[in-house]
């Protein structure tokens, strides 16, 4: 009968970094489940292959780091050396003898001659020993004797520096003092002279090794994408948080629908756009809308700035583009969002002067990746820019960023919706009217409205109010539009009178021009850097077209302040510089761009940028598309428009001289005249009166010589 063979136990292999699994886990690994479902955060957006095994797979943290059967090796640390040195110094301090009195060599000789020395140890540089404290009252200083007797009674230790004294030994022998030779104790200085340089060298060496190792690691990671990944609902933004841009939300809802149900479009043979370009002015909500799309679709969201691609090393930008798209393929369906695309996708230079080889190579790699990208993989590329005119045409062609979503500044209804979103966490007073506030903020983008609400809340908190009132919103609007109010400056009374008539001239002309915007406030309180006063006009509705008659009325309002100064004082000031500049620009646009000149006809005469410098970032030299004689005709037409406006304004102010004087007097008294006060003033019967004498003690800002700036409700 054959003996059963005895099985030898096999040597247990050392398996580092493996999972400790039971039989069920082993079966799961055979089936291909190598990833713990609970660690899916490392691979966001990818569901586990077998959800039923989610609770059965476990990692042994010790096994992942190191085999527990192996002894851990102790690593040498610089702290060991430092602790040892400190311990040695502590031992020396603790076990040293009692207090040692340091005395001059002359006192040592006095004690020797008086026979008070007990024993002496003579070293190379110092002499130490003990002496008797009895009968030394007249030998040492009184303060020193008191200190010695406080320390100890009887014999006391001393120390003194050795002086070249050849008769010292003879004197010690004559005094019958026991003395010995003693070498100096240099062990501490010797240790420090060896250990300290070694410690410094070791520290520098360790620091350099770590820096080199870190640099090597960073060099390996330099080509990796720097995109921030937000998983599913981590963006924290949905379409409910976006208001005032309903058209853009409707346009992007198709993207959300594709990411949620791609088969719906693929079944009919449709393909979702590969790239979506969000175009709009700063603050219109481009980045917010992209996050809302990712939050609605519930997919990973890769966020990266256009400037993050380019580094100081050549080729890094292209490598990061490749790595970004490679990561996106593994996380599909997902969204890649590139903010400030113009930093990366600027038009490639036509010549070698303005070329940027590294940026252009990065752009080329982006074009290649987008061109070879399969739109059915579920990866949507979104980008945002506020300068679409400088983007490379190859980037905007169909097949890349083939869908452009324009985000315009919100209209009246949109501004009201945006305000409702931003005031959700703000305690509002009952009289706050968001519709009225939206009407007073034409041209405000979403970021501007958010800033307005925040400023109003801060002003209310500064005044210790329990809720934000409408007055806080009015003050916040004035701060944003006109700048910080400066009441503490003392202004020359004559200059204050000039500013009052200047602003009154604007207001009177605006009230007598039916097509001009309505005056909402007139103030002679300085604001900001250069505004010594302002006349605020608020349009009653959003306007997208302006007629020639409306532009002429606006010209009249701009010249109202200058003509009022000339009419009242017979002289003009520098305060109208900004008015004249804006009036000249408006008149030139009417002639060169809008075709509103009878002499020049319907042709446009804009200065065109030189295409040689397009997209190079260099200063673009404008070239005229018309002759010198045409330029002279344009200048003549501009002067003609301004002269005609000046005559109309002068006629209006001369006919309303009484109201002009009265409104200026009212401004000198109240400093700020709102719409309610202005209506009462215009409806009241005004008696003619001479120009008012300004009050000298009214606090205002000093004359700066800078032009005043009127807010025209922009």
From Swiss-Prot:
Record's signal peptide: none
Enzyme active site: 503
UniProt topology in membrane: Multi-pass membrane protein
Keywords: ATP-binding, Cell inner membrane, Cell membrane, Hydrolase, Membrane, Metal-binding, Metalloprotease, Nucleotide-binding, Protease, Transmembrane, Transmembrane helix, Zinc
InterPro entries according to UniProt: AAA+_ATPase, AAA_lid_3, ATPase_AAA_core, ATPase_AAA_CS, FtsH, P-loop_NTPase, Pept_M41_FtsH_extracell, Peptidase_M41
Pfam families: AAA, AAA_lid_3, FtsH_ext, Peptidase_M41
Biased composition (Polar residues): 699-714
Chain residues that bind ATP: 280-287
Cofactor binding summary note: Binds 1 zinc ion per subunit.
Named cofactor requirement(s): Zn(2+)
GO cellular component: plasma membrane
Positions of region (Disordered): 688-714
Membrane-spanning parts: 76-96, 189-209
One example of a Gene Ontology biological process annotation: protein catabolic process
Side of membrane Cytoplasmic, spans: 1-75, 210-714
Disulfide-bond pairs as recorded: none
E.C. number: 3.4.24.-
Annotated binding of Zn(2+), by residue: 502, 506, 579
HAMAP family, sorted: FtsH (MF_01458)
Family designation: In the central section; belongs to the AAA ATPase family. In the C-terminal section; belongs to the peptidase M41 family.
Name by which UniProt lists this protein: ATP-dependent zinc metalloprotease FtsH
